[in-house]
Amino acid sequence: MTQPPVRLLVVDDERNIRKNLRMLLEAAGYQVDVASDGEEALAKSREQHYEIAFVDIQMPKMGGLELLRYLRGLSTKTAVVILTAHGTVARAVEAMKLGAVDFLEKPFDPKAIRLLVDEILLRRRLGPGGSIDALLHLAELAWGRKAYVEARAYLKTALLRDLTRPEPYYWLGFLYESEGDVRQAAHYYYLALDANQTFRPARDALTRLGWIDSKRS
């Protein structure tokens, strides 16, 4: 039996943003509704379940924070991603405290939006008991949209599940290396080799960094 398409909602008072996000998400295979303000979005949410809603934080009639409070009052399980312009990031952080799952700053990176949708949907399918491979995939999706804090959290959760797998150590090393912390990167690459002496990616990374066993701390 064919699964119905995932429904998403885009809420923004700027027509071009609604149009561009809708086109981007529909091209990725999702069914997308749009609303120009919080009141319209709330009415749609009472009639239809949305897996994810992209909500502008600053709109006429009803802004993003007020909409988020109403959605939580409806006990809806819609994951809310806040859309914010420069200067409203502090309010986006407030929205996170109210239950928003993430926020995106304008202008948007199309790749980051697609990866975020994939990440949220995968996280929901997995629930609290996701496999290590699934957590590694979540980390990869988060890294792809430059959400390094979230990527690191997924990897550390994977380590809590199984300390003997080399991949979480390796990818933690990769994250630290991408942020310029070579010493911490090497530490995790060595931990990957401790878990599996034949794990070639970690050995190659240490060779690339110019580290040898005598430098291990």
Give the label of every model feature segment:
Residues 59:
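Receiver (REC) domain active-site loop signature in two-component systems and cognate sites
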Residues 108-117:
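C-terminal output helix
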Residues 37, 63-66:
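Acidic catalytic/metal-coordinating carboxylates
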Residues 19-27:
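Charged docking surfaces used in two-component/phosphorelay signaling
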Residues 49-54:
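Active-site beta3 strand of CheY-like receiver
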Residues 43, 65-77, 191:
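Short amphipathic alpha-helix used as the core "switch/output" element in two-component signaling
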Residues 29-36, 44:
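Short hydrophobic/Thr-rich beta-strand motif most characteristic of the beta2 strand and flanking loop
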